[in-house]
């Protein structure tokens, strides 16, 4: 019998991150010592009080059977308290919270709940490639909103084609931004919410890096007037609490969006292990100093790395205003970021993420993650220094 995958599977975009790290695995098989600054995988451990909460909860027999389909009230109440404490936003834990098994799962579910075949989704370019996966599975169409450095990597809503707006039903925003490290303020969110309301577009704000803005406290989209009228915010435990492997996230916002998400997930999942929910609750209610300390560590790494690159390589980089990524231009001797990243892997055994993974506007950039200790960052620079690449000419011709 011939097994024939569905048309949806056949039309899925390439999983670019998987392809990049497949190359890394192949190189590691040769015995090479790889310095991986490509993946946004936090290198520091989950705080002990969170791990201990999971350990204790795992011994609780009440969590060993099926739990509530839509999550335990104690976690939703902790989420509401967290949003009130951090952003001054009031969340109804019963009607305005949905739980996910990770941010990627959340993006997928939200697209399935908000898009019909033929609808248009507005996404940033460059932007997180997983937005495209859910849009494709919903059989919707993609419209790219270009992000440019001169505009602070914020989309210009006024330049979106009116014909596109007639069919647009969903817009993704993401600040602090992956991959550029740009941030948005309350005024921008107010403008975005008003625009979405005017054109009847659902707005999903991906707040995965919400803990990491360096000059001031990040604003939540939900602080904006009309935010709950038009959309929801997706928050991940992965970066804020060093819990990437735990696969936990949540959405908060418009109760009709949350209701649709919960109804969808009722047919796909049977809740989340109660021990994980207990640990997540401990994370949200714990001492905020953990996150502040983590932010200081990333800022120190960014300052150290960018200064070292300029001093030793002549490679000038704009420091990110948020996240833990450096968005760096590539030398003009390379045509694409894929070509540059492949060259670094082959000749220096270091990994960066090609900017093209995030869209065509990333062709001349790579994303470098500050998820390694300073000794590794120094070794990364030392290895590239031996290649004698013309970073100086990059500055002269591109600025």
Curated annotation (Swiss-Prot):
Where does it live in the cell? Cytoplasm
Q: Which residues cross the membrane?
A: none
- EC number per UniProt: 2.6.1.-
One Gene Ontology term of the biological-process aspect is:
antibiotic biosynthetic process
Main enzyme class: transferase
An annotated GO cellular component of this protein is:
cytoplasm
Q: Any keyword Disulfide bond?
A: no
| Top-level taxon of origin | Bacteria
Which cofactors are reported in the record for this sequence?
A: pyridoxal 5'-phosphate
- UniProt keyword terms in alphabetical order: Aminotransferase, Antibiotic biosynthesis, Cytoplasm, Pyridoxal phosphate, Transferase
Q: What is its main location?
A: cytoplasm
Q: Which residues carry this modification: N6-(pyridoxal phosphate)lysine?
A: 239
Residues binding pyridoxal 5'-phosphate are 103-104, 128, 178, 209, 236-238, 247
Q: Which GO terms describe its molecular function?
A: pyridoxal phosphate binding; transaminase activity
Annotated function? Part of the bacABCDEF operon responsible for the biosynthesis of the nonribosomally synthesized dipeptide antibiotic bacilysin, composed of L-alanine and L-anticapsin. Bacilysin is an irreversible inactivator of the glutaminase domain of glucosamine synthetase. Catalyzes the reductive amination of the C2 ketone of tetrahydro-hydroxyphenylpyruvate (H4HPP), with L-Phe as an amino donor, to yield tetrahydrotyrosine (H4Tyr) diastereomer. D-Phe is not an effective amino donor. BacF associated to BacG converts 3E,7R- and 3Z,7R-ex-H2HPP to 2S,4R,7R- and 2S,4S,7R-H4Tyr, respectively.
What's this protein's name? Answer: Transaminase BacF
Please name the source species.
Bacillus subtilis (strain 168)
Gene assigned in the entry: bacF
């Amino acid at each position: 019998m011939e097994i024939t995958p569905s048309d949806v599977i056949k039309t899925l975009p390439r999983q670019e991150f998987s392809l990049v790290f497949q190359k890394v695995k192949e190189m590691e098989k040769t015995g090479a010592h790889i310095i991986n600054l490509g993946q946004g995988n936090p290198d520091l451990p989950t705080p002990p009080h969170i791990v201990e909460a999971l350990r204790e909860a795992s011994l609780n027999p009440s969590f060993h059977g099926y739990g509530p389909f839509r999550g335990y009230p104690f976690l939703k109440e902790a989420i509401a308290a967290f949003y009130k404490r951090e952003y001054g936003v009031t969340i109804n834990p019963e009607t305005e919270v949905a739980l996910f098994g990770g941010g990627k799962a959340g993006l997928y579910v939200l697209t399935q709940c908000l898009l019909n075949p033929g609808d248009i989704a507005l996404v940033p370019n460059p932007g997180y490639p997983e937005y495209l996966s859910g849009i494709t599975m919903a059989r919707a169409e993609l419209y790219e909103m270009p992000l440019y450095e001169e505009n602070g990597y914020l989309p210009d809503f006024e330049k979106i084609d009116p014909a596109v707006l007639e069919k647009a039903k969903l817009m993704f925003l993401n600040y602090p931004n992956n991959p550029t490290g740009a941030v948005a303020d309350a005024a921008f969110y107010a403008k975005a919410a008003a625009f979405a309301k005017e054109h009847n577009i659902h707005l999903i704000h991906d707040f995965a890096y919400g803990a990491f803005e360096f000059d001031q406290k990040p604003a939540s989209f939900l602080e904006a007037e009309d935010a709950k009228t038009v959309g929801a915010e997706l928050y991940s435990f992965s970066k804020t609490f060093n819990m990437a492997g735990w696969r936990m996230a949540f959405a908060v916002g418009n109760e009709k969006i949350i209701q649709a998400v919960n109804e969808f997930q009722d047919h796909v999942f049977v809740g989340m292990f109660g021990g994980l929910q207990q640990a997540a609750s401990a994370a949200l209610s714990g001492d905020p100093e953990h996150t502040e300390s983590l932010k200081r560590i990333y800022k120190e790494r960014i300052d150290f790395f960018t200064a070292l690159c300029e001093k030793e390589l002549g490679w000038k980089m704009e420091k990110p205003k948020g996240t833990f990524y450096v968005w760096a231009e590539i030398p003009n001797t390379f045509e694409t970021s894929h070509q540059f990243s492949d060259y670094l892997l082959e000749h220096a055994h270091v990994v960066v993420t090609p900017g093209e993974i995030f869209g065509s506007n990333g062709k001349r950039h790579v994303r470098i993650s500050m998820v390694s200790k300073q000794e590794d960052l120094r070794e990364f620079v030392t290895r590239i220094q031996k290649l004698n690449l013309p970073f100086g000419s990059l500055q002269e011709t591109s600025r």
